[in-house]
Swiss-Prot record:
Induction context: Up-regulated during adipocyte differentiation.
Keywords: Coiled coil, Membrane, Nucleus, Transmembrane, Transmembrane helix
Ranges in a coiled coil: 1-67
InterPro entries noted in UniProt: TMEM120A/B
One Pfam match: TMEM120A-B
Subcellular location: Nucleus inner membrane
Tissue: Expressed in inguinal and subcutaneous white adipose tissue and in brown adipose tissue.
Primary role: Necessary for efficient adipogenesis. Does not show ion channel activity.
Designated name of the protein: Transmembrane protein 120B
One Gene Ontology CC term in the entry: nuclear inner membrane
Family note: Belongs to the TMEM120 family.
Membrane topology: Multi-pass membrane protein
Length: 339
């Protein structure tokens, strides 16, 4: 037997030994996976049972509170606060357990589990989401500038509007996945992206004509301003969130948003004038489109629908921001009054 063949035989025996070890490791892995699945089912069942009983207990306490004494009312208030805190704990627990997708994710992805089981995977996905927002914001800014000042063609406008539709659709999917994994983004700042997706889709279907050309430059200028503000928000919110996480004041899955939240009060209030300017520009867009919808040459249904959509965006953004600012000012006033 030649020396080269002997080396091949030795290598084969080494690989055979490693293969046996791999098989044993894989057997243990499957066993642990089955144990993990059983534990996940047990935890999910126990959490559902606890939540159901706590809900019943909360209703009972609310009924009893009407006829309670002062001491009993204090005890009921304490128990109610404990129940609320327990519900927050369950929310954190469920972030690490498989769960059924909501209606939107079921429509888009089907019944596929999107739960990321490790903190490392959650943070990696969250960081990738933030980078996606940053890169697309820059691309949309460049696209809006190009369409406004260089490329005066309907086809390039359609490409830009299609990019907006794809961007907002992707954001809604990624945000839904992050919410399933424990991110606390909620309320209007989630709905905002669904409304923006619809608005971009209507803009995409708006045929070229006199009315479209009357609104085109205003919309592109608004898109440029909006992208600049979103870039500023991302840049400064990211730094603010990093500091607050280091102090233990924010969750590691908190996201940058295209608006104003209470945690931004320290260090990011300088963004408020830009945000309010953007909100009122949305109102200006709505008013302009309402006026254009009454133009004798206007035959497109998109004009009136876009006017309503911009009005909804203005009301949602403006009232939500105003609510946050008012609540924070009220809280600060109460603090200064305390001795």
């Amino acid at each position: 037997m030649s020396g080269q063949l002997e080396r091949c035989e030795r290598e084969w025996h080494e690989l055979e030994g490693e293969f046996q070890e791999l098989q044993e490791t894989h057997r243990i892995y499957k066993q642990k996976l089955e144990e993990l699945t059983s534990l996940q089912t047990l935890c999910s069942t126990s959490i559902s049972k606890q939540k159901r009983h706590l809900k019943d207990l909360k209703h009972t306490l609310q009924r009893y509170k009407r006829h309670s004494s002062h001491e009993e009312a204090a005890l009921i208030q304490q128990m109610t606060a404990n129940i609320k805190e327990r519900q927050n704990v369950f929310f954190d627990m469920e972030a690490y357990l498989p769960k059924k997708n909501g209606l939107y994710l079921n429509l888009v992805l089907g019944n596929v589990s999107v739960t990321l089981l490790s903190n490392q995977a959650k943070f990696a996905y969250k960081d990738e989401y933030e980078k996606f927002k940053l890169y697309l914001t820059i691309i949309l800014l460049l696209g809006a500038v190009a369409c406004r000042f260089v490329l005066h063609y309907r086809v390039t406008d359609e490409v830009f509007n299609f990019l907006l539709v794809w961007y907002y659709c992707t954001l809604t999917i990624r945000e839904s996945i992050l919410i399933s994994n424990g991110s606390r983004i909620k309320g209007w700042w989630v709905s905002h992206h669904y409304v923006s997706t619809f608005l971009s889709g209507v803009m995409l279907t708006w045929p070229n004509g006199l009315i479209y050309q009357k609104f085109r430059n205003q919309f592109l200028a608004f898109s440029i301003f909006q992208s600049c503000v979103q870039f500023l928000q991302y840049y400064y919110q990211r730094g603010c969130l990093y500091r607050l996480r280091a102090l233990g004041e924010r969750n590691h899955l908190d996201l940058t948003v295209e608006g104003f939240q209470s945690w931004m009060w320290r260090g990011l209030t300088f963004l408020l004038p830009f945000l309010f300017c953007g909100h009122f520009w949305q109102l200006y867009n709505a008013v302009t489109l309402f006026e254009l919808s009454t133009h004798e040459e206007c035959k497109e249904w998109q004009v009136f629908v876009l006017a309503l959509t911009f009005l909804i965006l203005f009301l949602g953004n403006f009232l939500t921001t105003l609510k946050v600012v008012h609540a924070k000012l009220h809280k600060n006033r109460n603090k200064t009054k305390q001795p």
